[in-house]
From Swiss-Prot:
GO terms for cellular component: cytoplasmic side of plasma membrane. This is Protein Syd. NCBIfam families: PRK04968.1. Belongs to the Syd family.
C-alpha cells in the first residue's frame, strides 16, 4: 500500500504528464515559484514544485485548540501548484492547492472560517480540499476525525463518503485535460 506522500506525488506526476500546459490565476504579489509564462494580467502557466518547508498548521491548531488530521497537513504541505482539475468516477473535481507561502496563509484563514462555521452549526469538523465543479456549493472535504474523504454542501454535514482515506481517493482521481486557458 502506498503512503499518502507517494499517492500525492503519483497524482502530480500523472497531472504533469497528461496536462502538459497548465494555467492558473496570476497573483503578481505572490511571486510564486510555480509561475512560468504570464499569459495576461490574470493568467499564468504553472509547473508544480515541492514546498521547501511544509505549510505549518501549528499556530492554527493552537488558536483553534484542535489538531488537524495528518492527511490534511500532508496534502497542503507537500507541493506548490495550481488547483488540479480531476475526474473522480465521472465527476469533475477541482482539488485545491497552494501556489506559494502567501497562498498557504490565505488557505489557513479560509480553513479557520470553515471550522468556526462547523462549530457554530454543531457539525463534525471537516476541512475542504476541493470543489465539485458540476454543482455550486458542493465541497470535497476530509473528516477531521476519521480522515474520510466525502462530499458536503456548504453549511451541511458530509453526506457522501467517497473514500476512507485521502491516499486511496487520490489514487482513483485522474487528471482532466483543460481545453483552453479559461477552463
Amino acid at each position: 500500500m502506498k503512503t499518502l506522500e507517494e499517492s500525492i506525488d503519483a497524482l502530480m506526476t500523472r497531472y504533469k504528464e497528461n496536462v502538459p500546459v497548465r494555467y492558473t490565476e496570476y497573483v503578481e504579489e505572490w511571486n510564486s515559484p510555480i509561475y512560468g509564462t504570464v499569459i495576461d494580467e490574470n493568467t499564468v502557466e504553472w509547473t508544480p514544485c515541492r514546498q521547501p518547508e511544509a505549510l505549518n498548521f501549528d499556530d492554527l491548531e493552537s488558536a483553534l485548540e484542535m489538531s488537524f488530521h495528518q492527511s490534511i497537513k500532508t496534502l497542503f504541505g507537500r507541493w506548490y501548484a495550481g488547483d488540479l482539475a480531476l475526474d473522480y468516477q465521472g465527476h469533475t473535481i477541482s482539488l485545491l492547492q497552494t501556489q506559494s507561502a502567501e497562498d498557504g496563509e490565505r488557505l489557513l484563514e479560509n480553513i479557520t472560517g470553515h471550522i468556526l462555521m462547523k462549530r457554530r452549526l454543531k457539525q463534525p469538523e471537516t476541512v475542504f480540499i476541493g470543489l465539485g465543479s458540476e454543482d455550486d456549493g458542493l465541497l470535497v472535504t476530509i473528516d477531521n476525525q476519521s480522515g474520510a474523504v466525502g462530499l458536503e454542501w456548504v453549511g451541511k454535514e458530509q453526506h457522501d463518503v467517497l473514500s476512507d482515506s485521502l491516499a486511496a481517493w487520490l489514487d482513483n482521481c485522474q487528471p482532466q485535460v483543460e481545453t483552453d486557458k479559461n477552463s
